Swiss-Prot record:
<feature type="binding site">
    <location>
        <position position="53"/>
    </location>
    <ligand>
        <name>ATP</name>
    </ligand>
</feature>
<dbReference type="GO" id="GO:0005524">
    <property type="term" value="F:ATP binding"/>
</dbReference>
<protein>
    <recommendedName>
        <fullName>Serine/threonine-protein kinase TAO3</fullName>
        <ecNumber>2.7.11.1</ecNumber>
    </recommendedName>
</protein>
<dbReference type="GO" id="GO:0106310">
    <property type="term" value="F:protein serine kinase activity"/>
</dbReference>
<keyword id="KW-0551">Lipid droplet</keyword>
<dbReference type="GO" id="GO:0006974">
    <property type="term" value="P:DNA damage response"/>
</dbReference>
<feature type="region of interest" description="Disordered">
    <location>
        <begin position="316"/>
        <end position="372"/>
    </location>
</feature>
<feature type="coiled-coil region">
    <location>
        <begin position="548"/>
        <end position="649"/>
    </location>
</feature>
<dbReference type="GO" id="GO:0004674">
    <property type="term" value="F:protein serine/threonine kinase activity"/>
</dbReference>
<feature type="coiled-coil region">
    <location>
        <begin position="753"/>
        <end position="871"/>
    </location>
</feature>
<dbReference type="GO" id="GO:0045669">
    <property type="term" value="P:positive regulation of osteoblast differentiation"/>
</dbReference>
<feature type="modified residue" description="Phosphoserine">
    <location>
        <position position="324"/>
    </location>
</feature>
<dbReference type="GO" id="GO:0097029">
    <property type="term" value="P:mature conventional dendritic cell differentiation"/>
</dbReference>
<feature type="modified residue" description="Phosphoserine">
    <location>
        <position position="343"/>
    </location>
</feature>
<dbReference type="GO" id="GO:0016740">
    <property type="term" value="F:transferase activity"/>
</dbReference>
<dbReference type="InterPro" id="IPR051234">
    <property type="entry name" value="TAO_STE20_kinase"/>
</dbReference>
<keyword id="KW-0723">Serine/threonine-protein kinase</keyword>
């Protein structure tokens, strides 16, 4: 989606549709930062006073700027707390987002700027209390501010403390981005990319630094280069309060906030119960502080206004002031200004505007314009008011006009209209009571000027932060890529394992089906063989029976014939008796044959049953052998499959191990490359900073050398004036002495006395002239020597400072490199332990599976043999009951398949 084109309904809901240029009027610039400017404005429909932060998302890094805007809007929409800035809405206009928020008087940093001295401890406690309540709310919802400092803690008219500027905030905790303002950054933020993540405890560190800022007018290390400050924070001990005037409770609170180890740092909710926060303080402490600050701002602006008015009137009457008049006027006004400010208890402070682009340090600050309607001499300024305020878009383009003053300073004397140039300078201090503020116009102008002047340093820090974020994105992208590669690798291995398992299952199913088919086939063959065997026995027995019967018939005939012959030979026996004896003999023979036949049939039946039983036992034994062969084949197949599976798992483990080592090497190589690039950039930035400082010092020295003749001329004129005064004194003394001598000496000696006095005067003037020349030469030489010595001392001090900063950078980089190498070593050891443990688990699993398989083999074979043995015993017992003897001799020998 093109930036700013609201095609996505979710994004479109973040912005209002009205035209902000028509909705908001009377815009005045009240702050400036890297993102753009902050304006005071009025809602044309409701007359509500608001603050507007304009953020452009065109130019370089458009996508990044647009994403920052979306993130800040989403973040602000979530906030509903008395100690966070109230969000009014966001509008889009010509590649610029108008972020509208409630208007506040100014920031805690402005208090230091106006009063030019540290705040009182009760005032710091009150401001810290409000900030902690806001932080507790953010941290409860897993939000991190990441840019807590005095410039981002705002104050309202009723004395309410508000957290503002959520451009650096994170909607996720923990986070690991390099964001914030250098001097307030927690160590874990600086080392976030190198050592891991951080949470809301970073805001607690920044709050501790802010307490030092409010107590000492500037954060620790503020006199140091911002980059060097980062290196210092990352590797040195936590800062502490320097002055001994603070209470032990305050000291403990600051030390508690600034624990180096985040886990030892307290949470915001815990700090709210600290003695420093809970102790009693006046309920109006912040309201009184704000009122004193507003009075001081009004007085400062009125002093500036009177200075401009005096210059304006002086120019109107006498023309432009000469140089000496201007210097004298500046000196006078400066002393007046100092007297007025000191009467309010104020001293100067270091500006809190951050040099960091990412910090978005310009808070929603504010200022006040007051208008003296009773000053007739300002009528011509009021006539130009329409020109100045006719267009809000012109206000911040024309010299950053900030105007204010107070009634009661008017001069009723009519004056002629001043020149246009002086009038434009006076426009800065016109009197119109437009809005209340605790920030003076000169402070706003100075901050805007500093923002323009520090662009190079700000761009350097912005580039450094951008590089750190880019490095982090590269690492995250690589980690995601490697994770996807590992997931794909594991999925591939898992599929291979599943395929092997499926194939093994299919093979076992095929084997089982094959074995079932073989058993069925063997059963059919056995049934057929048994039937054939039975038929063979029956056929043989039938044949034997037929032969036996035929033999009996022959024997019967032979016996019958033999008996007949015997009877025929015996003539003594009656015929009837013979017939009876023959019949009886025939019956006996038939009976004997019948018994023999029955015996034969019995023997045949017994033989048939015994042989059938024996054949069945042989079939059973053969079936047992087939079952043993089948189970042996199945178990061998399972063992082969399991061995193949184990070989595959070992191969998978080795390939995974190789991939893990390769990925770790790739990740560590990229990390080291990025660290080297980061260190190279840091070194280049430091060298560039060194050159810039040397150039600035050189320019300063050149300006001093150029200014020296003018200074020497002024000193020479001063010595000359002293010489002239001395000459005048001597001339007066000469005249007085001459008159006295002429009065006390005769007239004829007057000529000689005059000559003597003239010679004495000439001699003394010559000595005086020589002293004058000598004084000039000594002054010239001493000033030149003093300038050379001062410049040389400055050069030496700068070289020493830059050398210390370079040593600090080298120490920081060495520490980071050592920490990274140690981290890599830990990662390698952790990987080795994980790989070793995984291999041990795999080998243990293989052993357990092989043992389980062997146990299954033994149990199944044992179960089979026991079943077969029981079946054989049952068969033999039944055979015994059937009257058959031991059939084992006819059985096949058993084999031990175990």
């Amino acid at each position: 989606m093109r930036k700013g084109v609201l095609k996505d309904p979710e994004i479109a809901e973040l912005f209002f549709k009205e035209d902000p240029e028509e909705l908001f009027i009377d815009l005045h610039e009240i702050g400036h930062g890297s993102f753009g400017a902050v304006y005071f404005a009025t809602n044309a429909h409701t007359n509500e006073v608001v603050a507007i932060k304009k953020m452009s998302y065109s130019g370089k890094q458009t996508h990044e700027k647009w994403q920052d805007i979306l993130k800040e809007v989403r973040f602000l929409q979530q906030l509903k707390h008395p100690n966070t800035i109230e969000y009014k809405g966001c509008y889009l206009k010509e590649h610029t987002a108008w972020l509208v928020m409630e208007y506040c008087l100014g920031s805690a940093s402005d208090l230091l700027e106006v009063h030019k001295k540290p705040l009182q401890e009760v005032e710091i406690a009150a401001i810290t209390h409000g900030a902690l309540q806001g932080l507790a709310y953010l941290h409860f919802h897993s939000l991190i501010h990441r840019d807590i400092k005095a410039g981002n803690i705002l104050l309202t008219e009723p004395g309410q403390v508000k957290l503002a500027d959520f451009g650096s905030a994170s909607m996720a905790s923990p986070a690991n981005s390099f964001v914030g303002t250098p001097y307030w950054m927690a160590p874990e933020v600086i080392l976030a990319m190198d050592e891991g993540q951080y949470d809301g405890k970073v805001d607690i560190w920044s709050l501790g630094i802010t307490c030092i800022e409010l107590a000492e007018r500037k954060p620790p290390l503020f006199n140091m280069n911002a980059m060097s400050a980062l290196y210092h924070i990352a590797q040195n001990d936590s800062p502490t309060l320097q002055s001994r005037e603070w209470t032990d409770s305050f000291r403990r609170f600051v030390d508690y906030c600034l624990h180096k180890i985040p886990q030892e740092r307290p949470a915001a909710a815990e700090l709210l119960r600290h003695d420093f926060i809970r102790r009693e303080r006046p309920p109006r402490v912040l309201i009184d502080l704000i009122q004193r600050t507003k009075d001081a701002v009004r007085e400062l602006d009125n002093l500036q206004y009177r200075k401009m008015k005096k210059i304006l009137f002086q120019e109107t009457r006498n023309g432009p002031l000469n140089e000496s008049q201007e210097e004298e006027e500046d000196s006078e006004q400066g002393s007046n200004l100092n007297r007025e400010v000191d009467s309010l208890g104020s001293i100067h402070s270091i500006p809190s505007v951050s040099v960091s682009t990412g910090s978005r340090s310009s808070s929603v600050n504010s200022m006040q314009e007051v208008m003296d309607e009773g000053s007739p001499e300002l009528v011509m300024m009021q006539e130009d008011e329409g020109t100045v305020n006719s267009s809000s878009s012109m206000v911040h383009k024309k010299d950053h006009v900030f105007v204010r003053d107070e009634a009661g300073h008017g001069d009723p004397r009519p004056e002629p209209r001043p020149t246009q140039s002086v009038q434009s300078r006076a426009l800065h201090y016109r009197n119109r009571e437009r809005f209340a503020t605790i920030k003076s116009a000169s402070l706003v102008t100075r901050q805007i000027h500093e923002h323009e002047q520090e662009n190079e340093l700000r761009e350097q820090m912005s580039g450094y932060k951008r590089m750190r974020r880019q490095h982090q994105k590269q690492l995250i992208a690589l980690e995601n890529k490697l994770k996807a590669e590992m997931d794909e690798h594991r999925l591939k291995l898992q599929k291979e394992v599943e395929t092997h398992a499926n194939n093994s299952s299919i093979e076992l199913e095929k084997l089982a089906k094959k074995q079932v088919a073989t058993i069925e086939k063997e059963a059919k063959v056995a049934a057929a063989d048994e039937k054939k065997f039975q038929q063979q026995i029956l056929a043989q027995q039938k044949k034997d029976l037929t032969t036996f019967l035929e033999s009996q018939k022959k024997q019967y005939k032979i016996c019958k014939e033999k008996i007949k012959e015997e009877m025929n030979e015996d003539h003594s026996t009656p015929k009837k008796e013979k017939q009876e004896r023959i019949s009886k003999h025939k019956e006996n023979l038939q009976h004997t044959q019948a018994e023999e036949e029955a015996h034969l049939l019995t023997q045949q039946r017994l033989y048939y049953d015994r042989n059938c039983r024996c054949f069945k036992r042989k079939i059973m034994t053969k079936r047992h052998e087939v079952e043993q062969q089948n189970i042996r084949e199945e178990l061998n197949k399972k063992r082969t499959q399991k061995e193949m599976e184990h070989a595959m798992l070992i191969r998978h483990d080795e390939s995974t191990r190789e991939l893990e080592y390769r990925q770790l090497h790739t990740l560590q190589k990229l990390r080291m490359d990025l660290i080297r690039l980061q260190h190279q950039t840091e070194l280049e930035n430091q060298l560039e900073y060194n050159k810039r400082r040397e150039r600035e010092l050189h320019r300063k020295h050149v300006m001093e050398l150029r200014q020296q003749p003018k200074n020497l001329k002024a000193m020479e004129m001063q010595i000359k004036k002293q010489f002239q005064d001395t000459c005048k004194v001597q001339t007066k003394q000469y005249k007085a002495l001459k008159n006295h001598q002429l009065e006390v000496t005769p007239k004829n000696e007057h000529k000689a006395i005059l000559k003597t006095l003239k010679e004495e005067q000439t001699r003394k003037l010559a000595i005086l002239a020589e002293q004058y020349e000598q004084s000039i030469n000594e002054m010239m030489a001493s000033q030149a020597l003093r300038l050379d010595e001062a410049q040389e001392a400055e050069c030496q001090a700068l070289r020493l400072q830059l050398q210390q900063e370079m040593e600090l950078l080298n120490a920081y980089q060495s520490k980071i490199k050592m920490q990274t190498e140690a981290q890599h070593e830990r990662e390698l050891q952790k990987l080795e332990q994980r790989v070793s443990l995984r291999r041990a688990h795999l080998e243990q699993k293989i052993e357990e599976e092989l043992a389980a398989l062997q146990k299954e083999r033994s149990e199944r074979i044992k179960t089979l043999l026991e079943r077969q043995e029981r079946e054989t015993e049952t068969f033999d017992m039944e055979s015994l009951r059937m009257g058959f003897g031991n059939l084992v001799t006819l059985d096949f020998p058993k084999e031990d398949y175990r």
